[in-house]
């Protein structure tokens, strides 16, 4: 006997994961508040029909109506799971008997009194398949049924049930089981069956079942039927379920984290050599990206049951989530999702999978905001890895220090020609902009990276208006958290309490700092020797300019870039159409 039939619940207490339905039904039964029509809705295989039979059993129990049937009376025995049934409980499959003639026959039979039970119960399964004429034939008897008659409608699409019928029922929505509840159910059944199942098999079975207890038990039944020595191994489950080996997923994610094209396409080759479906691999890769995003956003996602994986796999996934930024993972998921849509019905899914991998490796091939954020994130990571810890620099002698510091202090009166009580002008802010950026860098390196390409445009009341050539970065800079960082940096550098707003536009002609020529002349007069800090700053500014450039080299067609990468990495040859 199939597992889902063998372990079918016999009472509301045995129904798993539907407490929001079984609890109010039990209270209503014990209190004697019985309605003449019920509507059970929800996804397939979540217990609607089984609960309808339990409700009929509870209503007709000799000690009922009760939420806990005795199980020994004639009605309880006949309505037990896998029992022959009762003459007073009629099940109608509306998928094959949903016409007006079938419902008229049911209506005529409904007026007869029950033979040996308290109620005559009609269970209409797949109720959404009943035609409009059939529902109209039932409408009058559902509105004003005899006292002994109860209808129970079960459907996966309650919106297709006639509204006049639906409004006269008590509607109970069923739902799918969460992974943690499903895993406990599977472990209990495997223990009762005396079968040992590897821990890595449970996530595969739960994912294949899609949260439906019936479908999940069917998958588990298939694995138990083919298990040798009552032991279900991870390797056997992979072969039977057609799931991609987690090692191949790890290889692909590690290659993406390292931007290693050869390793990524090598993983694709292993997928094809192993006989895996490219579409299934793309689906499993998308699910991995989802798990990494959740782990990065919710560190305790595993303990909450949001991410279901073995402990060793969770350690690898946490390491991968730490190596790849959130913006990069989001773009990876978007690209793979779009690729899955292109693979649907494709005759060459492998080629499309390789093109998707090429897009993953080339964020510059797209001008979308997610690709721009990924490029900024990459440059920020490079900055964190390349900038060493600050080292102590030996101080120059007093004689050498005098000619350096003295010219630098002379231009200061130029910045404040007005009385000290007045606030700085736009020109003063432009001249002090490098200092402001240094203050921003101390608070948020991400915000400072996004300032590359931003210029000071104007000062409106107490609001400093910036202009950025990139619309996505302008929106990011205008967000509250980034605007607060800029306001605090301005307060430290200039002693002002200003708000900051960033707009999109071309840099103003007057964006160059006022008094810049004097500063340059002073720098030339001093002519200090290049230091490690100045070289480091030059490298920083170069990378930041690369991140924030508004008008990069002309965009290339993403398909052309992907094909070029395939030619360079795999030696592919392009075949033009005849």
UniProtKB/Swiss-Prot annotation:
What InterPro entries does the annotation carry? AAA+_ATPase, DNA_pol3_clamp-load_cplx_C, DNA_pol_III_gamma-3, DNA_pol_III_sug/sutau_N, DNA_Rep/Repair_Clamp_Loader, HLD_clamp_pol_III_gamma_tau, P-loop_NTPase
Disulfide linkage: none
The entry's ATP-binding residues are: 42-49
Q: Which SMART domains match?
A: AAA
Q: What is its EC number?
A: 2.7.7.7
Q: Name one GO cellular component term.
A: DNA polymerase III complex
Extent of Basic and acidic residues compositional bias: 402-412, 536-559
The residues listed in the UniProt record as binding Zn(2+), with positions renumbered to this chain, are 61, 70, 73, 76
Reaction catalyzed: DNA(n) + a 2'-deoxyribonucleoside 5'-triphosphate = DNA(n+1) + diphosphate
Which CDD domains does the record associate with it?
AAA, HLD_clamp_pol_III_gamma_tau
Keywords (alphabetical) are: ATP-binding, DNA replication, DNA-directed DNA polymerase, Metal-binding, Nucleotide-binding, Nucleotidyltransferase, Transferase, Zinc
Q: Name one GO molecular function term.
A: ATP binding
Pfam families in alphabetical order: DNA_pol3_delta2 (PF13177), DNA_pol3_gamma3 (PF12169), DNAX_ATPase_lid (PF22608)
Gene Ontology terms describing biological process: DNA-templated DNA replication
Leading EC class: transferase
Task: Report residue spans for region: Disordered.
Answer: 389-423, 525-559
Which domain of life does this protein belong to? Bacteria
Protein purpose:
DNA polymerase III is a complex, multichain enzyme responsible for most of the replicative synthesis in bacteria. This DNA polymerase also exhibits 3' to 5' exonuclease activity.
Q: How does it assemble?
A: Interacts with the beta sliding-clamp (dnaN). DNA polymerase III contains a core (composed of alpha, epsilon and theta chains) that associates with a tau subunit. This core dimerizes and associates with the clamp-loading (or gamma) complex (composed of gamma/tau, delta, delta', psi and chi subunits) and with the beta sliding clamp dimer to form the complete DNA polymerase III complex.
Please give the family membership noted in the entry. Belongs to the DnaX/STICHEL family.
Q: Further notes on this entry?
A: Was identified as a high-confidence drug target.
Q: What is this protein called?
A: DNA polymerase III subunit gamma/tau
Q: Which organism is it from?
A: Mycobacterium tuberculosis (strain ATCC 25618 / H37Rv)
Which gene holds the coding sequence for this protein?
Answer: dnaX
